[in-house]
Design a protein with these regions (language model features):
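Transmembrane alpha-helices
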Residues: 197-198, 214, 218-258
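Periplasmic/extracellular loop-to-transmembrane helix junction in inner-membrane transport proteins
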Residues: 30-47, 67-113, 133-134, 284-296, ...
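Interhelical loop and adjacent transmembrane-helix boundary motif
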Residues: 169, 254-308
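Membrane-embedded alpha-helices of multi-pass transport/permease systems
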Residues: 60, 64, 119-126, 143, ...
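Transmembrane-helix boundary motif in ABC transporter permease subunits
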Residues: 36, 113-144, 317-326, 387-395, ...
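Cytoplasmic-entry segments and transmembrane alpha-helices of multi-pass inner-membrane transporters
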Residues: 120-159, 196-197, 330-358, 399-404
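C-terminal transmembrane helix and the adjacent membrane-cytosol boundary/short C-terminal tail
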Residues: 199-210, 214, 287-338, 382-388
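Generic hydrophobic transmembrane alpha-helix motif, especially the helices
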Residues: 145-183, 187
């Protein structure tokens, strides 16, 4: 009966406009009404679209500006002669505007920098994601990311004072401002990006794949190398591409330590030769060139070439990532493989096992015949020998060697960070005085302080934010 009375009351209230439970239409234009929410959503959508459109317009005008000022040099000299000319001497008589040596030097510096940073970066990322205890990780990871907060000019200053002097003394060369110095510095600068992105990619690998690998009897290193790392390959590839972008686009640090000689190293593997990059050329000459001159337009041509190289790297990265994802999805959807005759399986297994040895020998012999590059041949043969005996080493010993190399990677990164910070602190802190921080410079910068520079930097930062 009580339930019946409640139902009757509810029906009565629904039909009574004065009842609190009577459904009411929202007031038009009021806060929280559908019309107001729709207008707010529409306004936000238009605002975000305007922001995106503004960014696109800015980029378009930058590209148009570069192409407009670079066109005269392409018209006067020709694109082919500009790209393949061996001499860059804008102040000579007659002037020469060939950037082939600049392109080669930029690529060489980038390749050696990546050869340094990729193994150290991926090894350090594996340590942080898979091997480091929690307390160690909470200390080491922020320390590694601290490298990303060091300005490039500080890296360049350290390289100019410490690194070049070390190269000059240890390699007995007239100057330490070389290709090697620039690549080492760029490799260290690219490490934080590669480590952070790779570590995130490795850590995001599903836990189930690790547990499944362990359940099948795999060692920790076999799980990392054959299961976790392939699962995180797209993220690791993205990290490498970002590192390459940092190496290609860096200006100040490279400008300060490479010697800035627009020549191709002779022989090509002479890492102790001075070089000049595209970015270094822009940084050195743009501030002193006469506006509207041929030299001025040639520098804009250099900027366009640098832009094309960067764009090509990004497009290549997009293609590689797409292929990796496509291959990964195909591997997931493929449930079984068709097995052939036993002899074919044996031959395929044999080729799979020794293919690296065969490739190493063939490449080594080819390079020996063409370039007579004994060092590279020795490296290839050493790698081939390692792959040959790898199958005969127990998994536990392989794991010990691999973990030792990974530990060496993270210790090398921390050593580089420690050396840079220690040099800056030891040489800089004693000169930090109140007068130095609050006084303007005097005597043509030989005395006084840096207060105007601090204020100007803060203005730039606030304006950028």
């Amino acid at each position: 009966m009580k339930a019946g009375r409640d139902c009757s009351e509810e029906e009565h209230n629904r039909g009574n406009p004065s009842s609190p439970s009577f459904p009411r239409e929202p007031i038009a234009g009021g806060l929280g009404t559908p019309s107001h929410s729709h207008q707010k959503e529409r306004f936000i959508r238009v605002l975000w679209f305007a922001c995106a459109l503004f960014a696109v317009i800015i980029i378009f005008f930058i590209l148009a500006f570069l192409l407009f000022d670079a066109y005269p040099i392409f018209l006067e000299i020709g694109i082919w002669d500009f790209l393949t000319g061996m001499v860059w001497n804008p102040t000579g008589i007659p002037p020469a505007y060939g950037i082939y040596a600049l392109i080669v030097d930029s690529i060489l510096v980038m390749i050696l920098a990546m050869a340094i940073s990729i193994p150290l970066g991926i090894g350090s990322a594996i340590y942080l994601a898979e091997l480091a205890p929690y307390r160690v990780k909470t200390i080491v990871k922020p320390a590694v990311e601290l490298l990303a907060g060091i300005p490039s000019v500080v890296f360049g200053f350290f390289g100019l004072i410490v690194l070049t002097d070390w190269i000059r003394v240890n390699f007995d060369v007239p100057t330490g401002e070389t290709w090697l110095a620039g690549s080492i510095l760029l490799g260290v600068m690219a490490l934080p990006t590669i480590i952070s992105v790779s570590e995130d990619a490795i850590s995001s690998a599903p836990r189930e794949v690790r547990e499944g690998s362990f359940a099948l009897g795999a060692t920790h290193w076999q799980t990392i190398s054959r299961v976790v790392t392939p699962a995180a390959l797209s993220g690791i590839t993205a990290a490498i591409i970002l590192g390459i972008g940092r190496a290609v686009g860096e200006t100040m640090a490279v400008l300060m330590v490479t010697g800035n000689a627009a020549v191709i190293p002779d022989p090509i593997w002479n890492v102790l030769s001075p070089v000049r990059t595209l970015t270094g050329t822009l940084g050195i000459e743009m501030g002193e060139v006469a506006i509207g001159s041929t030299h001025y337009h040639a520098l804009f041509g250099v900027a366009v070439v640098l832009l094309v190289i960067t764009l090509a790297i990004n497009l290549l990265a997009t293609v590689i990532l797409a292929r990796i994802k496509e291959k990964h999805m195909a591997a997931k959807t493929c449930s079984a493989k068709v097995a052939g005759p036993r002899e074919q399986q044996w031959f395929a297994g044999y080729v799979q096992k020794y293919r690296n040895v065969l490739i190493g020998i063939v490449l080594g012999l080819g390079l020996l015949a063409v370039f007579r590059w004994i060092g590279l041949l020795a490296a290839l043969l050493g790698y081939s020998a390692f792959r040959l005996i790898q199958g005969r080493i127990s998994p536990k010993w392989t794991q010990r060697v691999a973990f030792s190399l990974i530990l060496f990677c993270i210790l090398s990164v921390l050593f580089a960070l420690g050396v840079i910070l220690l040099d800056i602190i030891v040489k800089g802190v004693p000169y930090l005085t109140w007068e130095f921080l609050t006084a303007p410079p005097s005597n043509l910068g030989r005395s006084g302080g840096i207060f105007p520079a601090i204020v100007g930097t803060m203005y730039l930062v606030i304006g950028a934010i």
